[in-house]
């Protein structure tokens, strides 16, 4: 009996312990901070006192402390790495003056000196070792001085001149919750997670600064001054942004007095504190009475130049507060502040947000609604934004869309709406939904339940925000709007000022609704589209393009087309295609053209069908392309011009390999193409009976098989590309490797290195006839001319011209030299054996660029080419073993048109020019290339997945 009683007591005790451990708890961290701004050195000197209360069932022996200004300390931080991955080198190439840091920390815990240890990976996190363990339900007083050098505003916080955005600025405890510690480095893509507490902050600034901050201002005199002040007129000067290619207009305020003032702000039950200071702010304020009778003070801080868009900003804040209070629950704070601060982009903090107006009043309304809405999602419902960004950004987006539909009847507002009716009729009613559909259609989306830092930059906005908004709409449809609203209001009531996780949200929704929502919530962890009401598609014809209601229509677009070459002259026709978003599996483009000179119908076209066999963006494309134009002509003795036509058909198979890392900008593919080409040749025969010459244009057929393997990384820092290509035709095989590597310069531009190595083989014996027949396929030191474009893949104005300007066109292939020796029967550097070359291109430094004084930029570069080939290594070779050329290059239209002026070159080229071009030599040595076929959207925007 005693044993049974003992077991019973143990069981009851154990049950009690388990219940206690499973009960919700969260830490409380109160902050008292004194800080002084030095607006000459752009520094902060402060002292922080934390009252850390351990409400957990665990004894703590250390506390992780975030020192986030150290994210800007050097180029070896998580912030820097992510910025590079997201396509920005601004911080990476910034100088020490533009960077920031935090130092002079001297922690004491309950009056006892405490040591810190560095985080094993991140410079902006330290481990505070507690002198004495902190048991459950006990508190510790932690204090330290700190010094911050504010960086330029590369991300959310810092300064731009004397405009200050002071965010993530003080030593701050990381969260310890039921899932453990959550130390996290500062990231631009990826927000935060912090404990609730009560804040009292004293800010000392020069007295002519207007300050906006979290919480309620305690200085009555300052409130009066803000309402009565008139900001000074700005004195604009042009300053260059760190790491930027072009100077940006930044306002330099009129110098003010050196006297200071100390402002006191208080706010309970928040998890962060931010403040903003500028002498140029215009300040407006008003009040709003909520249904409960509580009065909220709404204030805006904006700049004079943006006054038109901000004129009704107070009304916008009021609408945001009213709708969110109605749909979710009443706004609990007494103040709400919105700050005009587009320098660092928008970001929300408790009771205050900084944002860009978006360029119009309507877009400002949209952004204010979104950022003020974050007071509910993450400000009050304080989920872990870094791990579960959908719980704040996505839920908030759902309510953005709901507000936009109610206020404007569309979710697009003015962000993408054009003043042109033509454009508006072609823009989608739901742009974000269209982008979600587009990314899921090609299987390059990611699950909604993905950590912020694991999204690529495109998906972070499309998935965490927009796709989650779609998922919330699905949840609303399943529950019905009244029940959905009841669930969300209960979620807010139960979890306000707490840290909900996804499982908490699911449990509550199922409890309130009485539904099993396993299938719906499972969608959060899956790729693919959110189920939408089914729609039948019809075929619709439209002019140019349309993104309107692509879920209902399969579009066929028509647009006028124009073309030109030397033989056909002007060509007019139509462009037919079905390219739109989301991409369809079957795509086509067809452009029939009528040539005004040759009086024949030409054209170009392509059809493809794509399969997506995996779940990581793999793609198998089957395609066929074709083209038919005049590639030459012949004028007979009677003056009749006979065009010589070429026609090609090129079936192909292309496979894009999977990319395991969605954030990677790496692309790999393998492609097989067969070119079936028919060319009209020129044939002279003699009629021996009638003693006349007969000219005919028989068709000649040939083929070429081509295998390519390409690996390309369009990362912003040191992008590269490598291509292996094997061509096989009648009697030969041609192998080539082309590599490109770009070395970035700190202030824009860089050194572009290209290398080529090629080898030519004969199948069977090498004969004079084979040498003659394979001449267009052989390796060239100089960029090949039109007749050497053996697959007709490049655009040439005069493909077979040997005089006038059109004869000076080359293509960037093989050795890539810019000097031409077209008049030689055996061009210098042409070989049917092997060839190696390197090409370097770099911007011309302003110090020696005479055109740098112009008010507009002319993209002049310097090129240098060096190479060798088999013939140079033979006995008694006419050239040295290595040849070179160098000169100036003018690159226009994103390098589509390049003009080359050789100035220095090997002796063999000098001798050629002297012997063949005795006078007016300069312009005849100029070359140019037109590289339309190399246009690649991903080189300009690597994060775009299309």
Where are these regions (language model features)?
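Short loop/turn motifs that connect adjacent beta-strands in outer-membrane beta-barrel proteins
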Residues: 548-554, 582-586, 612-620, 658-670, ...
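Glycine/proline-rich low-complexity spacer/linker segments in large multi-domain proteins
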Residues: 75-89, 147-199, 288
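A surface-exposed beta-strand-loop module
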Residues: 53, 88-162, 249-258
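C-terminal outer-membrane beta-barrel translocator/porin domains of Gram-negative envelope proteins
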Residues: 560-562, 602-604, 618-641, 650-654, ...
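Transmembrane beta-strand segments that form the barrel wall of outer-membrane beta-barrel proteins
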Residues: 554-566, 572-580, 584-596, 618-630, ...
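N-terminal, polar/Ser/Thr-rich
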Residues: 20-45, 160, 519, 531-550, ...
């Amino acid at each position: 009996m005693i044993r049974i009683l003992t077991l019973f007591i143990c069981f009851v005790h154990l049950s009690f312990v388990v219940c206690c451990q499973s009960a919700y708890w969260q830490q409380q961290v109160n902050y008292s901070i004194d800080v002084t701004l030095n607006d000459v050195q752009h520094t902060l000197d402060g002292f922080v006192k934390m009252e850390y209360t351990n409400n957990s069932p665990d004894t703590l022996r250390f506390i992780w402390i975030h020192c986030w200004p150290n994210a800007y300390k050097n180029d070896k931080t998580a912030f820097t790495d992510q910025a590079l991955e997201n396509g920005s080198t601004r911080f990476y190439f910034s100088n020490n003056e533009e960077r920031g840091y935090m130092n002079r920390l001297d922690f004491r815990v309950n009056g006892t000196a405490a040591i810190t240890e560095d985080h094993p990976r991140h410079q902006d996190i330290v481990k505070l070792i507690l002198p004495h363990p902190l048991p459950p339900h006990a508190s510790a007083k932690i204090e330290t001085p700190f010094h911050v050098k504010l960086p330029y505003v590369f991300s959310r916080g810092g300064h731009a001149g004397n405009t200050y955005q002071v965010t993530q600025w003080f030593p701050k405890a990381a969260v310890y919750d039921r899932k453990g510690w959550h130390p996290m480095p500062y990231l631009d893509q990826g927000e935060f997670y912090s404990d609730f507490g009560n804040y009292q902050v004293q800010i000392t600034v020069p007295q002519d600064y207007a300050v906006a901050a979290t919480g309620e201002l305690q200085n009555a005199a300052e409130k009066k001054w803000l309402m009565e002040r008139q900001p000074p007129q700005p004195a604009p000067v042009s300053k260059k942004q760190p790491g930027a290619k072009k100077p940006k207009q930044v306002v330099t305020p009129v110098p003010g007095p050196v006297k200071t003032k100390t402002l006191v702000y208080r706010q309970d039950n928040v998890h962060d504190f931010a403040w903003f200071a500028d002498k140029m702010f215009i300040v407006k304020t008003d009040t709003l009475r909520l249904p409960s009778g509580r009065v909220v003070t709404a204030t805006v801080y904006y700049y004079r130049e943006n006054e038109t868009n901000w004129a009704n900003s107070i009304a916008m804040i009021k609408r945001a507060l009213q709708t969110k209070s109605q749909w979710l629950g009443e706004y609990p704070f007494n103040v709400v502040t919105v700050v005009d601060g587009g320098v660092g982009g928008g970001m929300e903090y408790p009771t205050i947000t900084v944002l860009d107006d978006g360029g119009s009043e309507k877009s400002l309304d949209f952004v204010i609604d979104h950022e003020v809405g974050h007071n509910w999602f993450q400000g009050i419902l304080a989920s872990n934004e870094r791990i579960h960004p959908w719980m704040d950004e996505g839920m908030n987006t759902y309510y953005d869309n709901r507000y936009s539909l109610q206020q404007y009847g569309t979710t697009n507002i003015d962000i993408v709406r054009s003043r042109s009716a033509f454009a508006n009729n072609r823009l989608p009613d739901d742009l974000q939904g269209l982008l979600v559909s587009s990314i899921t259609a090609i299987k390059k989306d990611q699950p909604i339940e993905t950590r912020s830092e694991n999204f690529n930059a495109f998906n972070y906005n499309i998935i965490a925000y927009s796709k989650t908004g779609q998922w919330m709409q699905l949840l609303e449809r399943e529950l019905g709007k009244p029940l959905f609203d009841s669930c969300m209001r209960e979620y807010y009531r139960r979890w306000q000022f707490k840290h909900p996780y996804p499982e908490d949200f699911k449990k509550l929704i199922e409890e309130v609704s009485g539904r099993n929502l396993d299938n719906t919530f499972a969608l959060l962890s899956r790729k693919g589209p959110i189920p939408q009401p089914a729609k039948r598609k019809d075929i619709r014809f439209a002019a140019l393009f349309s993104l309107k209601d692509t879920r209902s229509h399969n579009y066929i677009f028509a647009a006028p087309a124009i073309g030109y070459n030397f033989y056909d002259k002007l060509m007019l026709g139509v462009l037919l295609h079905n390219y739109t978003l989301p991409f369809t599996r079957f795509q086509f483009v067809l452009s029939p053209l009528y040539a005004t000179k040759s009086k024949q119908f030409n054209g170009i076209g392509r059809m493809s069908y794509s399969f997506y066999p995996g779940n990581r963006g793999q793609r198998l494309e089957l395609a066929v392309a074709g083209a038919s134009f005049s590639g030459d002509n012949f004028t007979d003795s009677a003056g009749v011009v006979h065009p010589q036509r070429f026609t090609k058909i090129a079936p192909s198979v292309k496979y894009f390999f999977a990319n395991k890392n969605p954030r990677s900008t790496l692309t790999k593919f393998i492609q097989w193409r067969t070119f079936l080409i028919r060319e009209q040749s020129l044939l002279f025969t003699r009629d021996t009976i009638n003693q006349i010459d007969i000219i005919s244009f028989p068709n000649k057929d040939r083929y070429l098989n081509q295998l390519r393997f390409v690996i390309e990384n369009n990362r912003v820092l040191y992008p590269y590309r490598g291509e292996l290509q094997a061509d096989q035709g009648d009697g030969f095989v041609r192998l080539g490797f082309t590599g490109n590597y770009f070395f970035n310069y700190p202030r824009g531009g860089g050194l572009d290195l290209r290398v080529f190595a090629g080898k030519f083989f004969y199948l069977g014996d090498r004969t004079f006839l084979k040498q003659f027949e394979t001449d267009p396929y052989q390796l060239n030191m100089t960029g090949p001319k039109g007749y050497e474009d053996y697959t007709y893949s490049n655009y040439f104005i005069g493909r077979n011209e040997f005089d006038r300007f059109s004869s000076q066109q080359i293509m960037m292939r093989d050795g890539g030299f810019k000097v031409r020796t077209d008049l030689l029967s055996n061009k210098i550097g042409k070989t049917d054996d092997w060839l190696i070359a390197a090409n370097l291109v770099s911007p011309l430094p302003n110090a020696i660029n005479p055109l740098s004084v112009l008010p507009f930029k002319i993209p002049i570069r310097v090129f240098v080419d060096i190479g060798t080939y088999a013939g140079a290594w033979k006995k008694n070779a006419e050239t040295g073993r290595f040849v070179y050329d160098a000169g100036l290059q003018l690159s226009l239209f994103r390098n589509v048109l390049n003009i080359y002026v050789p100035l220095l070159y090997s002796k063999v080229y000098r001798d050629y020019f002297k012997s063949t071009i005795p006078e007016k030599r300069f312009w005849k040595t100029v070359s140019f290339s037109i590289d339309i076929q190399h246009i690649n959207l991903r080189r300009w925007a690597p994060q775009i997945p299309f």
